[in-house]
Amino acid sequence: MHALGRIPTLTLLIFINIFVSGSSCTDENQTIQNDSSSSLTQVNTTMSVQMDKKALLCCFSSPLINAVLITWIIKHRHLPSCTIAYNLDKKTNETSCLGRNITWASTPDHSPELQISAVALQHEGTYTCEIVTPEGNLEKVYDLQVLVPPEVTYFPGKNRTAVCEAMAGKPAAQISWTPDGDCVTKSESHSNGTVTVRSTCHWEQNNVSVVSCLVSHSTGNQSLSIELSQGTMTTPRSLLTILYVKMALLVIILLNVGFAFFQKRNFART
């Protein structure tokens, strides 16, 4: 009977913690699981942070729980796993995450929050906070995803074309044009998980002189204006005009040459 009474208490504490801590920590796409057989309550959270920004990962508020041991288990995608733990009874702090810019946000006996001072691609992975209490264990799992803003470049091409490129973004950026043109977009994936997107567009209409490239990304959007190179279109009428001009120039040249020839001949006779 006592074991059954533990679970509702833990569930209530979790609900209060999510509501209160939402003002200081970013919680996205949370799911709560309650395992009555093992007295384990788990919260899963997906978190996206821009590269070079500070990340704050919340656990359960220790003042609300009679915690004994707080442990962060960190599993990076491209680095060995490491742990950061604090024993509240012994007041001891242990870590195997040295050199990764991952520390307690404050003193763990007051707040078990974890912070990453400057997020990098190597910090992607899962961060699990485990709190051991006499009433049961609490577990909060973060899936940390790093966002990388792309480097945007653009330039006009030949024959009324323009190129817009979003280099090394994560996730891949999306490129659109105004007005619409005849576009070809290609993507190139890199070994670090970033993607370069390159879009080349062509406009046949002579009345289009300036176009806009919109680069959409999770870290922010950029809109750029490009002035098209004023390449002339070779229509049949323009080809005929060019031909007539060339023929007229040729006739003039021949007349001048002939006139000079006869003048020289007449001069030689005299």
UniProtKB/Swiss-Prot annotation:
Coiled-coil residues are none
Q: Which residues lie on this side of the membrane: Cytoplasmic?
A: 263-270
Q: Where is the signal peptide?
A: 1-25
Q: Which SUPFAM superfamilies match?
A: Immunoglobulin
Indicate the principal place this protein occupies in or around the cell: membrane
Enumerate the spans annotated as Ig-like V-type domain.
26-145
Pfam families in alphabetical order: C2-set_2 (PF08205), V-set (PF07686)
**Per its record, how is this protein called by name?**
Cell surface glycoprotein CD200 receptor 4
Origin species: Mus musculus
Mind giving the lineage of the organism this protein is from? Eukaryota, Metazoa, Chordata, Craniata, Vertebrata
**UniProt gene name:** Cd200r4
